[in-house]
């Protein structure tokens, strides 16, 4: 089936109203894209943070009369002489196959591979985590996930307990278990993340060693030898009292989801309690690691 796409330049104030209207007049999907390569940092809970200049992209059936769509947009004052727009035909493709073709096995550190289930495992003797993009973020493609996976690969996790704080897909907890950890706990605020982590753990044969909790249901006395939190700088600082209490004496802490420009403020929050190591950076993101200080 072929499609017609209209791309309209808008602002963050008008983009969502334009999106609603496009759906009302027959668009089968609407997406937002950045017009000027402007980064977006941490949104508040429940907030849809958009760029100052936002492109609204709507997809219509190929039989749609786009002249009528443009007329309706003008009539509703979503389109005027100052609004740039472009209409183009979209080639019909096997989108599912193209999406799958974009994911390949990825290596992290010396031993660890993350592999989509539809790909052959590159090294049968490696530590292979089978993980498909799906219910929650975290497949190894983002620099922060990669930094955390490489850190875990470099640790001696044999017989260790691990907490994945903000577990998402469960990728870090599952990788830790397959790297030798005795047990792991995944914590998240999102029930979808708990579901995704459970499904991924079952796929990798480690579900019996992974406990999962919503953040407000975790045991009050929970502690582990290794704690990793790949969330965002703001929450990492705000949750310092909680995260630091999860680490056993002489235990290891790994933090990511942090921009390089935010690293110092996160280090400042944790430095009294942890002996921090040099910050590791990749593509403007970084990882902070350290050991809990002993009195």
Curated annotation (Swiss-Prot):
Reaction equation(s) it catalyzes: L-lysyl-[protein] + 3 S-adenosyl-L-methionine = N(6),N(6),N(6)-trimethyl-L-lysyl-[protein] + 3 S-adenosyl-L-homocysteine + 3 H(+)
The keyword S-adenosyl-L-methionine appears for this protein: yes
One of the record's GO cellular component terms: cytosol
Enzyme class: transferase
Keywords from the UniProt entry: Cytoplasm, Methyltransferase, S-adenosyl-L-methionine, Transferase
EC number(s) reported in the record: 2.1.1.-
Protein's UniProt keywords contain Methyltransferase: yes
Domain of life: Bacteria
TM region(s), chain numbering: none
Pfam family, one: PrmA
Binding site for S-adenosyl-L-methionine: 145, 166, 188, 230
Any GO molecular function: protein-lysine N-methyltransferase activity
Location (main, coarse): cytoplasm
CDD domains assigned: AdoMet_MTases (cd02440)
Compartment(s) of residence: Cytoplasm
GO biological process, one term: methylation
Family: Belongs to the methyltransferase superfamily. PrmA family.
Biological role stated in the UniProt entry: Methylates ribosomal protein L11.
Protein name as it appears in the record: Ribosomal protein L11 methyltransferase
